[in-house]
Amino acid sequence: DWISLTSLFSYIAKTNNNSTLNLINPNNDKDIKAAALSYDIETIGWTTDAVVKPFKGFDFHFLFTYQSPKYKKYETGVTFSDGTTSGINATGNIVTEIPKVLIELDPSYNITKDLKVWASFRYFSKTYANIKNAYYFNGRWETFGGINWNVNKHLSLSGNCDKLLEPDRC
C-alpha cells in the first residue's frame, strides 16, 4: 500500500482533578490562604494520521491534531480575616501548556537497506502559561533530523541534529 490514512473525532473528559491554590489578600500581600479545588477538563478533538510511500525507500508521515481542552468547574474563593474576598474562576479557559493545533511532518529515506536519513518538523500552536490565559507562548516549530547506519548486526551508528532550521546549532 502506498498510503495509510486514519482520522478520528473524539471527546475526552477527566473529572475530579484536585488542587490547592494559594490566594492572596488584595489588601495585604502577606495574607495568603490556601483554597481547595476540584475541577474537570474536557476536550473535543480531531486527529488525522497518514503515512505515504510514493516510491521505494521513501516514507512521509503526517499527523494533524486539533483539540480544544478547557477547564470546567474551575472556581474557588476564600474570605480573609479582614472580610476581603479573593477567588478565581477559570471555567471555560484553555488548559495550560496544551496547544490547540499539533502538526508533525516526518520524511525519511532509506538510501540502502542499512542507511537511512530522516527529519522531523513539529508545530505547536499558541500555549497558555497560566490558568487565567493572560500569558502565553506563541506557536513554534521544532525541527530535528539525522542519519542511521546499521553497520552490522552488532553495531549501529547514528547522528542527530536538533534545530535543523538553525544549522549553526546542530
Enumerate the language-model features and the residues they cover:
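Exposed loop/turn and edge beta-strand positions of beta-sandwich/beta-sheet ligand-binding modules
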Residues: I44, V101, F137, W141, ...
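Asparagine-centered polar/low-complexity signal
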Residues: A36-S38, N133, K163
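C-terminal beta-signal and adjacent terminal beta-strands/loops
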Residues: Y123-N130, N148-C170
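Short glycine-rich, acidic/polar surface loops and turns
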Residues: E142-G146
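Gram-negative outer-membrane beta-barrel transporters
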Residues: S4-K14, N18, K30-T127
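Short, surface-exposed loop/helix-turn segments at secondary-structure junctions
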Residues: I131-F137
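Basic phosphate/pyrophosphate-binding loop/patch that engages nucleotide-derived ligands
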Residues: D1
